Regions:
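ER/Golgi luminal nucleotide-sugar-dependent glycosyltransferases, focusing on the catalytic module
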Residues: 1-265
Length: 265
């Protein structure tokens, strides 16, 4: 039996942080499905923190969905995207371990996140698409000379979507050691910089593993391999699954633990 799929414990030492951006009725459906998937496998005692990043509030509606043990934070920092999950986790400390996800991530089976490491990306990716003109200035903002050198190495991987499992102890360490996430909250303000953030978190994870003598890994492996293994068997390319229409129209393997839907935001 896989360690993360063992018998459900009586108590849970983690919660979920979901970054939400609603810009139309189609994207309003995504976060609700993500919430329903969480509640299908995790009881109401598991808290969900939703960080709303500059949504158009006229589209944010859920008349048929009751939110239980859920806190919604309206961020005062628009367009920061996934960085907000780490910023508010550090600021609010809603639980001791966070599962950081997008509003377009749908969990399809129970995973005992409490048994996992204090820091682990959900997905990794190879660095074939690095943009040093964006990423190096972000690294320098963290004011750690060693990171500048490590960035040039080929040893570390990107953290797809900046999604991870991370403990409060770890996020506090990253803030004290590397000024992450607070130093970047005034810097990350575009899609390109949010893509750079995927590399920054991967770089910090690499450093964390070295300091703690931990082997680097990600929970679901390389995102490109994951897409091909779990989606393509049914005759369509996973990158083409947009919004709820495509999600509902396609079949997935029963063993697929998590599904990512694309929303082009």
């Amino acid at each position: 039996m896989n360690k993360v799929d063992s018998v459900k414990p009586r108590g849970f030492g983690f919660g979920f942080i979901m970054t939400r951006h609603v810009c139309n009725s189609a994207t309003n459906e995504l976060w609700q499905e993500s919430y329903r998937c969480i509640r299908k496998y995790y009881p109401n005692t598991v808290k969900i923190l939703i960080i709303d990043d500059n949504s158009k509030q006229e589209f944010v509606k859920h008349p048929n969905l009751e939110l239980i043990n859920t806190e919604i934070v309206q961020s005062e920092f628009p367009k920061r995207g996934e960085l907000l999950s780490y910023y508010y986790f550090l600021k609010l400390r809603p639980f001791e371990k966070a599962v950081v996800i997008h509003d377009s991530i749908f969990i399809k089976r129970f995973i005992n996140f409490s048994l996992l490491d204090d820091f682990c990306p959900l997905f990794s990716f190879k660095r074939n698409w690095d943009n040093p003109n964006i990423e190096i200035p972000l690294v320098k903002q963290l004011e750690n000379s060693k990171l500048n050198r490590v960035y040039q190495s080929k040893e570390w991987l990107g953290c797809f979507g900046v999604m991870s499992i991370i403990s409060y102890k770890t996020i506090n360490f990253l803030q004290e050691e590397y000024n992450f996430p607070n130093k970047l909250i005034s810097i990350i303000d575009s899609r390109e910089k949010r893509m750079g953030l995927e590399r920054i978190l991967g770089l910090l994870y690499f450093e964390y593993c070295k300091k703690n003598s931990i082997k680097m890994r990600s929970l679901f492996g390389d995102i490109h391999n994951f897409i091909q293994k779990n989606y393509s068997i049914f005759g369509f390319h996973g990158w083409s699954c947009y919004f709820m229409t495509d999600y509902n129209a396609h079949k997935y393997l029963d063993t697929t633990p998590i599904i990512k839907v694309w929303a082009s935001r």
